């Protein structure tokens, strides 16, 4: 498969023609239901990726192998449609999956509309990281279990990208636009792959809560912004499990909590600093906040005062503490 960019539409009138059109797949397609054959494939390729959406008017039995050097994700275009892929029905929450040169078989119903994403295997491993990439068996897995919202995101993303580049093919010459599309695709893949190692249903509420505690401990003194994947790795669970743990416990996302934690770090440092020598902007920058104006608004909404007001109260006496009262040190 060439890495140059391109977009187009392929229309075929028999299964053998369709087979040839789908190369680099190595497939045998058998038409099962009677009638004149028609298939339409709308595709786009960029940065080594090949995305397409396909319509087939007849029921098909397909056998063969996925393209060498690529992994694939696929799904029917609608939640109601079903495709039998390697012995299991593909539906929301279950994506068709295959590694490089993986033997596959599937039954495609008449009138099927489906989407497929092919991505270079080396890129998939790079985005996943060595640890996750080795756990996800590209040669053995045929199905990728994920949250239904993730599979829906993949479907809609492929539809959007194919439509976008078919309508405006000159965008394929824009490296930044293509790179942004690559990031979106790989982010969706990483979200889906996270659930391969630790399904949400396999992790008890107690284990999720312990993972939540490990995550907030890890985040407590982080000054730099990090992603959810790093936080999940530190907590020893998948991204999806960590997101559920945060929703169950705090009703916030891990991303929101990470920002909240760093804002508290700024507040602690402002409260401990000397007003005549410290600068709010510098303290904010140390904690990874590069937009002082936006930060000041968020800070005021959270703490009810501006960052500069916190800095000015550094000499404020400590409040009465309950332990002081218990020790009889408070006399009023």
Per-segment meaning from a language model:
Residues 56-57, 76-78, 119-120:
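Solvent-exposed residues in well-ordered beta-strands and their adjoining turns
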Residues 64-67, 108-110:
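Short glycine/proline-enriched turns and hinge-like loops at secondary-structure junctions
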Residues 1-36, 82-239, 248-253, 268-292, ...:
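Alpha-helical bundle regulatory/interaction domains
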Residues 66, 208, 259:
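Short, conserved glycine- and acidic-residue-centered signature motifs
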Residues 34-45, 49-66:
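Conserved short histidine dyad/triad with adjacent acidic residue
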Residues 66-81:
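Short, conserved beta-strand element in jelly-roll/cupin
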Residues 250, 258, 262-267, 300-303:
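C-terminal flanking helix
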Residues 242, 246, 294-295, 299:
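Short hydrophobic/aromatic patch on the recognition helix
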């Amino acid at each position: 498969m060439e890495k140059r960019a391109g977009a187009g539409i392929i229309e075929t009138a028999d299964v053998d023609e369709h087979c040839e059109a789908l190369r680099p797949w190595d497939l045998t397609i058998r038409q099962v239901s009677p009638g004149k054959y028609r298939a339409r494939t709308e595709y786009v390729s960029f940065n080594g990726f090949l995305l397409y959406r396909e319509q087939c008017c007849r029921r098909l039995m397909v056998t063969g192998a996925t393209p060498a050097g690529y992994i694939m994700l696929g799904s029917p275009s609608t939640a109601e449609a079903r495709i039998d892929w390697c012995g299991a029905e593909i539906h929301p929450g279950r994506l068709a999956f295959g590694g490089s040169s993986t033997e596959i078989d599937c039954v495609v119903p008449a009138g099927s509309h489906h989407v497929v994403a092919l991505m270079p295997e080396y890129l998939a491993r790079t985005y996943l990281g060595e640890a996750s990439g080795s756990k996800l068996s590209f040669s053995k897995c045929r199905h990728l279990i994920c949250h239904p919202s993730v599979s829906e995101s993949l479907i809609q993303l492929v539809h959007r990208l194919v439509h976008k580049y078919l309508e405006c093919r000159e965008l394929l010459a824009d490296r930044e636009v293509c790179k942004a599309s690559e990031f979106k695709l790989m982010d969706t893949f990483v979200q889906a792959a996270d659930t391969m190692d630790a399904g949400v249903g396999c992790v008890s509420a107690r284990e999720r809560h312990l993972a939540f505690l490990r995550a907030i401990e890890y985040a407590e003194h982080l000054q730099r912004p990090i992603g959810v994947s790093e936080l999940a790795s530190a907590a020893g669970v998948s991204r999806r499990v960590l997101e559920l743990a945060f929703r169950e416990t705090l009703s916030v996302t891990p991303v929101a909590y990470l920002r909240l934690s760093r804002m508290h770090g700024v507040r602690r440092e402002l409260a401990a600093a000397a007003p005549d020598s410290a600068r709010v902007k510098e303290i904010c920058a140390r904690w990874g906040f590069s937009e002082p104006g936006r930060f000041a608004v968020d800070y005021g909404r959270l703490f009810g005062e501006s960052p500069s007001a916190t800095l000015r109260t550094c000499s404020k006496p400590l409040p009465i503490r309950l332990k002081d009262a218990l020790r009889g040190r408070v006399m009023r």
